[in-house]
């Protein structure tokens, strides 16, 4: 898997480099229809009536400064092709790349998801002047909302399906001594429950949130690992995905706090514990506490997104040095370094899933445990009052008995 991924990245960079060179040496550009098509036809007719003038203009434009044009084109080709490959690798889109030989130099078959999930009706005039209607690829639109699945959405569907199959297959194999896949799944589930949920939320309330934490851990883990598979895509490198994962944690955290302290206690917490006698300070504490609600999901979003994007950019940058410096000797150092970063990314996939789950449980536990501590303090207060009353009554009895003894 590692070698195949690195070879795929290297081939994509080389093909992009070749495309850049082809563009520099006069590759024909695709024709694009514009509203000024009639003017173009008239200009073409004029050029046909005066071929010498058109040829002279073309020759002057083509041979104006060939050395300067070649140098600028080469530099722009290198920069644009390498940068485009790096952005294309992490960007979302409608085109899904599947393994297979589809002709030409490409080792991947490109499937346009707009052709699969949606069509668009277009009316046009044929060569005989008749109005015809045909179907072309277009977005899947409901009202004004584009609902066409992108490749990152497809990756999430595939990850969810594989996750369900793996978990159900592991759970069905019930035995006293777990082995193989069931042992591995059970180990991870027990780790999430005992080492993450219980330690951060507490034994009393942990099991209520374990299903979400386990689901988030495995879902993020599978998406991270998918990004290291050739022809796949890293959905967690899309900030829209990480935002929604953080939103789920945010909503569950608010639900846990309202369930623990009630609606009144939830809004009372916005004052930051400042008593009513110091109510002018509420104008400072309430905005601070309100912003604090959103800094936690923001941290979850940026942490996961930035780490996944950075790892892929480092690998692509190391492989891109071969083509940027135009020397095969660079591969002696860049390929082993890229391979080591790739192996590190396997570890990072688990680490980022763990960090997201751990921080989510920490945020949930901060609102649940705070309520538990308040109840505990109240119980201790009542106990201390009862104990103090008992000691007081005992002291009064002793004091009352003293004169008798005297």
Curated annotation (Swiss-Prot):
Gene (name only): atpB
Family of the protein in this entry: Belongs to the ATPase A chain family.
Gene Ontology CC terms: plasma membrane; proton-transporting ATP synthase complex
Domain of life: Bacteria
Function field: Key component of the proton channel; it plays a direct role in the translocation of protons across the membrane.
UniProt KW keywords: ATP synthesis, Cell inner membrane, Cell membrane, CF(0), Hydrogen ion transport, Ion transport, Membrane, Transmembrane, Transmembrane helix, Transport
Recorded topology in the membrane: Multi-pass membrane protein
InterPro entries: ATP_synth_F0_asu, ATP_synth_F0_asu_AS, ATP_synth_F0_asu_bact/mt, F0_ATP_A_sf
PANTHER family in UniProt: ATP SYNTHASE SUBUNIT A
Subunit and interaction comment: F-type ATPases have 2 components, CF(1) - the catalytic core - and CF(0) - the membrane proton channel. CF(1) has five subunits: alpha(3), beta(3), gamma(1), delta(1), epsilon(1). CF(0) has three main subunits: a(1), b(2) and c(9-12). The alpha and beta chains form an alternating ring which encloses part of the gamma chain. CF(1) is attached to CF(0) by a central stalk formed by the gamma and epsilon chains, while a peripheral stalk is formed by the delta and b chains.
Protein name: ATP synthase subunit a
Compartments where found: Cell inner membrane
Pfam families from the UniProt entry: ATP-synt_A (PF00119)
Molecular functions per Gene Ontology: proton-transporting ATP synthase activity, rotational mechanism
Biased composition (Low complexity): 22-31, 43-59, 383-406
Region feature Disordered, mapped onto this chain: 22-76, 375-406
Record field: transmembrane: 151-171, 209-229, 232-252, 278-298, 304-324, 351-371
